[in-house]
Amino acid sequence: MTDNLGKMLNKIKNAILVKHEAVLIPYTLNNFLILRILEQEGFLDSINIVCKKKKREYKYIKVYLKYNEQTSKSFIRNICRLSKPSLRVYTNSKKIPRILNGLGIIIVSTSKGVMTSKDAYSNNIGGELLFSIW
């Protein structure tokens, strides 16, 4: 059993720690949707789909990390995994926690797709709490 979300989050964390400009993440639809949300929320600079050929074609997502120009600190301060394969965390829309009084977000997997905690609350949809980011 593979944990693609966990691998993606660890690659992003490690790239931030060593101040890489970009990181390659294996393409899955779930990874792409989550990264697109993080880009829209301002945590990432941009994302591109890249193809690499070896014996067969592999798709990757090239994620360009966003840093503050003056302090060279990342816009992502912390990523905290909430739901994992061994312990799933589900909640309804009224009990979705707030991160740092709204400065951070929680990514929620709902029946309507992957969305932020703000969108899930406004649409009155609960689901699985994947991770928090601030």
Swiss-Prot record:
Any one of the GO BP annotations: translation
Principal location listed in the UniProt entry: plastid
Keyword Magnesium listed: no
GO cellular component, one term: ribosome
Keyword rRNA-binding (UniProt): yes
InterPro entries membership: Ribosomal_uS8 (IPR000630), Ribosomal_uS8_CS (IPR047863), Ribosomal_uS8_sf (IPR035987)
Subcellular location: Plastid, Chloroplast
Domain of life: Eukaryota
GO MF term list: rRNA binding; structural constituent of ribosome
Role, per record: One of the primary rRNA binding proteins, it binds directly to 16S rRNA central domain where it helps coordinate assembly of the platform of the 30S subunit.
HAMAP family referenced in this protein's UniProt entry, alphabetically: Ribosomal_uS8_B
UniProt name for this protein: Small ribosomal subunit protein uS8c
Organism the protein comes from: Bigelowiella natans
Protein's gene: rps8
